Amino acid sequence: MHAYRTHTCGALRASDTGASVRVSGWIHRKRDHGGLVFIDLRDHYGLTQLVLHPETPGFDVVERLRAESVIKIDGEVVARDAAAVNPNLPTGEIEIRVSAVEVLSEAAELPLPVFGEPDYPEEIRLKHRYLDLRRETLHKNIVLRSRVIQSIRSRMFAQGFNEFQTPILTASSPEGARDFLVPSRLHPGKFYALPQAPQQFKQLLMVSGFDRYFQIAPCFRDEDLRADRSLEFYQLDVEMSFVTQEDVFAAIEPVMHGVFEEFSAGKPVSPIDGVHTFTNDFGATLEHRGFERLTYAQSMAWYGSDKPDLRNPIKMQDVSEHFRDGGFGLFAKILGADPKNRVWAIPAPTGGSRAFCDRMNSWAQGEGQPGLGYAFFSKDQNGWGGPIAKNLGEGFQPIADQLGLTHDDAVFFVAGDPAVFAKFAGLARTRVGTELKLVDEEQFKFCWIVDFPMFEWNEDEKKVDFSHNPFSMPQGGLEALETQDPLTIRAYQYDIVCNGYELCSGAIRNHKPEIMLKAFEVAGYGAEVVEEQFGGMLNAFRYGAPPHGGLAPGIDRIVMLLAEQVAIREVIAFPLNQQGQDLLMNAPAEAQDRQYKELYIRSAPPIKV
């Protein structure tokens, strides 16, 4: 017989009745019933009920053991009485009548209970993560993560991709966040950087003659934390040679759709076999297969976000023309003050009551806004009520017609420069959808966001800057960079969004040195700066670079959505807290004087004033 087990705690069934077995595991729960002791023994695979009689050797020892002590038992599998069968357990038809027991490890008093999974402060959970990970929900999340990564790998290999590893110790590069620096002992005063992404290396692999690359890549970014962001994370890093944007979409859509369909527990996933029509920012209507597509401009105008939750059916509309000639003086004044200003409407299906409108108005004020203009259908007056409808009178009906409002609806308005209010309008749309229970939470709704602006205005530095990935190919190439207003140039950049979360970003790369240098020049970087920071890749492009592109879905966010969690810490085995601390290993920690000397550095903590 094996030293510790013949079966796992999730393996035994009614067909095993009469068998002599050995199992080992943790005491999940212990109950004393009139002299008999019942134990739910747990391991990675499940639970099995044990029965100990007073005459069982070791009975007295087991009686005093705490929960989470580890034991090994020998015994006979017996059928439970019909009244004691637990249909919720795979092992619920049997129990083990214990004949011998050995304590393998005795547990001290627990700082964090495992059974029952009560809510506990995150600080305690992270400090005792080894106990937290024994809890069923978190344990399943980590197993799910493993299975998702395995599924992704299989799907990538099936499409002809090769998995390569890229360096962890590399050079610093401006990727949009601060680097984690690693001092070099062999080169005093110099530092490595941990990769924010394997961006340059995966492009260099394409220049090196490889074609379809992927890896499950660790990435490190010293940035402010939030529920869906961590200082260290993993991404499915992908790059392909001789591809267009459409080729990249066609390669990754089956992977994303397949993984979500495999692990969605029956929830519908956006199909990829249907045909969609898509109108770009220049008015061209195109047909395509796969996930729905929105341009960045459309996404901001309709949803107030570049990562819209399309489970929410509300689509905002521009209703500026209804207010230009007066009727509601405040909006007319705002529109007349600047040609960029607009009035957006946020329909609220079934929200037609003053109480709901007042509640939304109070919420807006809590968000630091003066309030929300609104109108609603008043059943008492059998007509449209609210200050805006009252001022417009019959002039409100064309707005209702444009928005498709019915006699159960309301509508909210925001006015000003969309660049300023779009984010708040998006929050208001989300709030309306949530309050009115319009969001179908039992589905995974995907879309592509395409045609991102190549550049944006940096108000702090009063200059044009890259809006996203600086290595993207501008639409129109060198001619666009030389002749167009930089703020009108689109890039071949794209994101995948699911249920309001950005799951990945990607781009067709700028593989021509002259276009790359010009793009950086537009953003205020001289050729010498580009050569210094990106010389390795730039020089490689001078020796023949294929057109290439890629993207990088975030593993943590994918698993977070599939596990129905709201924080990625719930799908990471040993995460940092929101202050970037590892409470289990006590990191970050001060280094020893010897280590500072070996690295030729000194620590100068900030002076508190």
UniProtKB/Swiss-Prot annotation:
| Location in or out of the cell | Cytoplasm
Site features described as Important for tRNA non-discrimination, chain residue numbers:
H33
Q: Which residues bind L-aspartate?
A: E175, R221, H468, R509
In the Enzyme Commission scheme, what number(s) does this protein have?
Answer: 6.1.1.23
Q: Which GO terms describe its biological process?
A: aspartyl-tRNA aminoacylation
Where does the chain cross the membrane? Answer: none
Which Pfam family name is an example for this entry?
GAD
User: GO: which molecular function terms?
Assistant: aspartate-tRNA ligase activity; aspartate-tRNA(Asn) ligase activity; ATP binding; nucleic acid binding
Q: Which reaction does it catalyse?
A: tRNA(Asx) + L-aspartate + ATP = L-aspartyl-tRNA(Asx) + AMP + diphosphate
Q: Where does ATP bind?
A: R221, D222, E223, E502, G554, I555, D556, R557
A cellular component term, taken from the record's GO annotations: cytoplasm
Extract the ranges annotated as region (Aspartate).
199-202
**Enzyme type, top EC level:** ligase
Q: Which InterPro entries match?
A: Aa-tRNA-synt_II, aa-tRNA-synth_II, aa-tRNA-synth_II/BPL/LPL, Asp-tRNA-ligase_1, Asp-tRNA-ligase_1_N, Asp/Asn-tRNA-synth_IIb, AspRS_core, GAD-like_sf
Kindly give the SUPFAM superfamilies that the UniProt entry links to this protein. Class II aaRS and biotin synthetases, GAD domain-like, Nucleic acid-binding proteins
Q: Which UniProt keywords apply?
A: Aminoacyl-tRNA synthetase, ATP-binding, Cytoplasm, Ligase, Nucleotide-binding, Protein biosynthesis
Record's function text: Aspartyl-tRNA synthetase with relaxed tRNA specificity since it is able to aspartylate not only its cognate tRNA(Asp) but also tRNA(Asn). Reaction proceeds in two steps: L-aspartate is first activated by ATP to form Asp-AMP and then transferred to the acceptor end of tRNA(Asp/Asn).
Provide the assembly information.
Homodimer.
Q: What is this protein called?
A: Aspartate--tRNA(Asp/Asn) ligase
